Amino acid sequence: MPIITLPDGSKKVFEKSVTILEIAQSIGAGLAKATIAGKVNDVLLDATIPINKDSKVVIITSKDKEGIEIIRHSFAHLIGHAVKQIYSDIKMAIGPVIEDGFYYDIFSEYRFTPEDLIKIENRINQLIKTNYDVEILQVSKEEAIKTFKERDETFKLRIIEEIPEEGLINLYKHEEYIDMCRGPHVPNTRHLRHFKLLKLSGSYWRGNSENESLQRIYGTAWAKEKELKDYLTRIEEAEKRDHRKLGKKHSLFHIQEESPGMIFWHPNGWTIYQVLEKYIREILKKNDYLEIKTPQAVDKSLWEKSGHWEKFRDDMFTTASENRTYAIKPMNCPCHIQIFNQGLKSYKDLPIRLAEFGSCHRNEPSGALHGLMRVRNFTQDDAHIFCTEEQIQEEVSTFIDLVFEVYKTFGFDEIIIKLSTRPEKRVGSEDIWDKSEEALTKALDNKNLKWELQPGEGAFYGPKIEFSLKDCLNRVWQCGTIQVDFSMPIRLDATYVDIDNEKRNPVMLHRAILGSFERFIGILIEQYEAKFPIWLAPYQIILLSITDRNIEKCLKFNELINNNGYRSKVDIRNEKIGYKIREATLGRVPLIAVIGDKEEEIDSVALRALNGKNLGIFNLPNLFKLMDELIEKKGRTE
């Protein structure tokens, strides 16, 4: 007689084994109708699997985070059900849940088209309307192999080969279609309503380009129609803001096949990059960082000693010279330790903060590359703080202030913070892990910050804090991080002399605010829709002549503005002024200055903001004053 304990502490006794659905039914018909699955002793379980012993049970509906993930996973199986009915000689690979949706990788000689997406979506809708039950079959490995051999599902058989002999495998039966999954899934298709198939893309089995080429169908699903519509609106807005499109439109950068994952910065984009670098350099200087520069190519012996050769070798670019193998650095930390190691260090010298705008290369798979967001060559705003155990909390606390200051400058007010603690496999004593985790926790709590704990998610060499931005489309971008490292200073012989005149290894804090310049600029392009605030814009002001008579004044003002340290350009084409204003607006120039006969007569410009607001008549001294104010507050002119 299982005794079921519910979240409110109440208990229900059943005479025999009982399912989640039956428990829900005993509470109320409405709850039973809404039940998708359950959590039994903190483990997710299908709604129709019997519970035989005393358990703590949480009933899951579409209102729960787990519920919507189960709905999305079930929709992935519906893709399989639909394509198997429509197309012949299809083999299903994997169909996981991803953020805001799901996908299924499919092997087929037939190439799917956007028209096929519509056809598949229509078939899914037909299947949903039949309200069929999704059956779960728990079978042995042998039975699972037999099932998928009969169906000639090559990829499923490969997955089964990797599963241990003992235990049962969950098969989910959607009428005539059978798929394999850990589950859980919805008990009936009536729970599957609000979805949309989004796009097609290519992929490889297991993400390896040497394996079979697959076709990926992406989709999204939500609990409510409004949530689906809101998401599709966000997707549409995201496409408008796509940094790759805007980068091309505004001549910021490009990427070409001869150098995949590496950026060709155009003058406009490089200006943004340089302004960003200058700003970060000022922040670093103000906070007592020492800027350094380290080599691009380093003998593999250093990477072997640091441990990167063993873990990262496949992701490194290498080159050979005079019988020596060099790695193009994928990260900066081992090189920073080499600088720390030059000369004897005392505890009185600590903390030492070494910063570098370090250019790194990583051999990312070509299929994973994505504009500025995922590249092979990137520059980190990287720094390493060498300190004592006792200094960790203060250094982390100061860094948190720095992160919030920088993010606020760019208009990011919603910051998500996650603290990752010790994993099972780790180096260092329990004592230093305790001290480090306590230091990071106190640094966060002393600032009354909301943060999320990620137990066991720290690196093997120390705990870390991650900082993620939420943008105008509610997308989350992980950018900043501060990571405690006990291991690398030991591996690379970094030492200082303590108060007792004994040599000790410092703690090293890896930290970055932006993450990488390339990715952060990509985020900014999409956040601002390329309407950069005046301090960051490639050109801060454009001067427009109304007639040919005003060209000379335009050119003279342009020279004076540029000579005073601002970024200015002119449009002196023989075009109507309305057309020029429209072109300047489409070009996203923050300030538009018009010079006609009236303005020239009083040695001034008629100024307007990018949003069309008339700012008035300005002579050059007043224009400079306004621009200085706008640049100083790092704001937009709108």
From Swiss-Prot:
Which biological process terms from the Gene Ontology are attached to this UniProt entry?
Answer: threonyl-tRNA aminoacylation
Q: Where in the cell is it found?
A: Cytoplasm
Which keywords appear in this protein's UniProt record, sorted alphabetically? Aminoacyl-tRNA synthetase, ATP-binding, Cytoplasm, Ligase, Metal-binding, Nucleotide-binding, Protein biosynthesis, RNA-binding, tRNA-binding, Zinc
List, alphabetically, the SUPFAM superfamilies matched: Class II aaRS ABD-related, Class II aaRS and biotin synthetases, TGS-like, ThrRS/AlaRS common domain
HAMAP family named in the record: Thr_tRNA_synth
Q: Which GO terms describe its cellular component?
A: cytosol
The cross-references to PANTHER family, in alphabetical order and at most eight, read:
THREONINE--TRNA LIGASE, CHLOROPLASTIC_MITOCHONDRIAL 2, THREONINE-TRNA LIGASE
Q: How is the cofactor bound?
A: Binds 1 zinc ion per subunit.
* TGS domain residues: 1-61
| Gene3D superfamilies membership | 3.10.20.30, 3.30.54.20, Anticodon-binding domain, Bira Bifunctional Protein, Domain 2, Threonyl-trna Synthetase, Chain A, domain 2
Describe its function: Catalyzes the attachment of threonine to tRNA(Thr) in a two-step reaction: L-threonine is first activated by ATP to form Thr-AMP and then transferred to the acceptor end of tRNA(Thr). Also edits incorrectly charged L-seryl-tRNA(Thr).
Official protein name in the record: Threonine--tRNA ligase
Region (Catalytic) residue spans:
242-533
Which species expresses this protein natively?
Prochlorococcus marinus (strain AS9601)
**Reaction catalysis annotation:** tRNA(Thr) + L-threonine + ATP = L-threonyl-tRNA(Thr) + AMP + diphosphate + H(+)
Look up the record and name the cofactor or cofactors this protein needs: Zn(2+)
